[in-house]
């Protein structure tokens, strides 16, 4: 229904909110169970750019950021929001420290260049699924 709203330019899937609404234990279960695939196919049909969140760091997070970022490329995502854990301002108060954290965006951009030429998206999708099942204890 949302894809028919007039004036809609882009859609962002809030994985945390959606996973809570669906009673999931972990927000990336929505990648593993095909929910995101199903949604983005509808957005593609409607010609709407889309994205989903969130990305911590390439190595950080329960599900490594590299795996999440590669899923963005597999699914044709046009945007991602950095997660709170990327730069937790409740813990990081020093501006210099914040600047250092954001310098890591360079490594994310470099990894994106690799993703643009990747041919192992299906392999990554399976790895994500297995990792998520392990995280949620199934």
Language model features with spans:
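Expand to "…catalyze enediolate/carbanion chemistry for C-C bond making/breaking, isomerization
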Residues: 1-138
């Amino acid at each position: 229904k949302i894809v028919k709203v007039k004036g809609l330019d882009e859609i962002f899937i809030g994985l945390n909110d959606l996973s809570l609404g669906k009673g999931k234990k972990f927000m990336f279960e929505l990648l593993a169970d095909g929910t995101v695939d199903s949604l983005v196919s509808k957005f593609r049909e409607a010609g709407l750019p889309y994205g989903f969140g969130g990305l911590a760091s390439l190595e950080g997070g329960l599900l490594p950021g590299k795996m999440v970022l590669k899923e963005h490329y597999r699914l044709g995502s046009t945007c991602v929001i950095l997660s709170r854990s990327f730069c937790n301002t409740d813990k990081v108060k020093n501006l210099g420290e914040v600047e250092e954290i954001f310098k890591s965006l360079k490594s994310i951009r470099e990894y994106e260049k690799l993703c643009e030429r990747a041919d192992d998206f299906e392999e990554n999708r399976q790895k994500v699924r297995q990792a998520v099942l392990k995280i949620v204890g199934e």
